[in-house]
A protein has these predicted regions:
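Short, solvent-exposed loop/turn elements at domain surfaces
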Residues: 47-55, 70-75, 83-86, 226, ...
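Primarily auto-inhibitory N-terminal propeptides
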Residues: 25-29
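Functional-site microenvironments in short loops/helix caps that host divalent-cation chemistry
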Residues: 129-279, 288
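Short, structured beta-strand segments at or near domain termini in extracellular proteins/domains
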Residues: 288-298
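Bacterial N-terminal signal peptides that target proteins for export
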Residues: 1-6
């Protein structure tokens, strides 16, 4: 009987632990002191890229120090809706994309010129709301990275401000610098370095096997409510180049409609935060674990 009671208790605990995360629950609010409008200069030259440290080079460019925040994206939507650059399509925001060249490769899908999904407003994970007139951000997420945004939505944001998504090589150089480190901050990873699966940060809800994003620049050496972060900037001063959210990159490869992401996320294991790890999805894909940052030519 005791064994039966214990089994019931264990089953109840497991069922409770599998309950879905309440995406609308209040979240901790911390001030990081990091300005999301800051850009970093990346010099021209060679660097090591990939798992096997191959040599590549880039021209000089600039890249955002943080991911685009939800507040920044809401500001973009308000401006773009006012001037007709985007439009509502039911519970979705769509915008024009000029299309890709189609090569007819097996499994390649056509991406034609037209209106494509930027963000879904009707998805439960969306942190931006629309009252019929104005886009606003769900309270507490203003300085978190913009998520649940498609590749088209990331591309459209950057294009609107005369910038672009970084290439994979540009992203990796900004994350790694010119040495052979596997992580933006060095050779090893600890829980205080980044937001990843089971990192035990203040935004993680392990009781339901879920987690939330952290504000951009959160891992800067500060202590937040007893949680000690480690200054985890890349050699060029970029934050969150590992963990928190995957980041869309701008490459459009011949014969392939998939787009690539870098950096790992709050939902990936620590080893998937290594600089050379890649992920890919269709350009209409969106997720609470995917965001982006912009780059621009000097």
């Amino acid at each position: 009987m005791k064994r039966f009671t214990l089994t019931l208790c264990l089953c109840a605990a497991l069922l409770a632990s599998c309950a879905p995360v309440d995406l609308n629950a209040p979240i901790p609010t911390f001030e990081t002191g990091i300005d999301p409008n800051t850009w970093a200069q990346i010099p021209a030259g060679e660097f090591h890229h990939g798992q096997f440290d191959e040599t590549a080079s880039t021209e000089a460019y600039e890249i955002m120090v943080t991911d685009v925040t939800t507040a920044q994206y809401a500001d973009f939507l308000n401006a773009a809706l006012a001037d007709g650059s985007i439009k509502m399509d039911g519970g979705k925001i769509v915008g024009f994309y000029p299309g890709d060249t189609f090569h007819g490769v097996k499994h390649e899908e056509k991406i034609e010129a037209g209106d494509w999904l930027f963000i879904p407003l009707d998805d439960p994970s969306q942190r931006i709301q629309f009252d019929g007139t104005t886009f606003t951000v769900q309270s507490g997420y203003e300085k978190h990275p913009m998520t649940s945004v498609t590749w088209f939505g990331a591309w459209g944001y950057c294009q609107y401000f005369g910038t672009r998504l970084p290439t994979e090589l540009e992203w990796e150089k900004a994350a790694r610098g010119t040495d052979e480190r596997p992580f933006p901050w060095g050779d090893e990873i600890q829980r205080g370095h980044a937001n990843f699966y089971s990192s035990r940060d203040p935004f993680e809800d392990m009781a339901s096997f879920g987690s939330r994003t952290s504000p951009v620049g959160f891992y800067n050496g500060q202590v937040y409510d007893g949680f000690q972060t480690i200054d985890s900037t890349s050699p060029y001063g970029l934050y969150d180049m590992a963990g928190n959210v995957w980041q869309w990159t701008g490459d459009v490869y011949e014969g392939m409609h998939y787009r690539f992401m870098r950096g790992g996320s709050k939902d990936t294991y620590d080893m998937d935060l290594r600089i050379w790890v890649r992920n890919n999805a269709t350009p209409t894909y969106f997720s609470p674990g995917v965001g982006f940052r912009c780059a621009r030519d000097e």
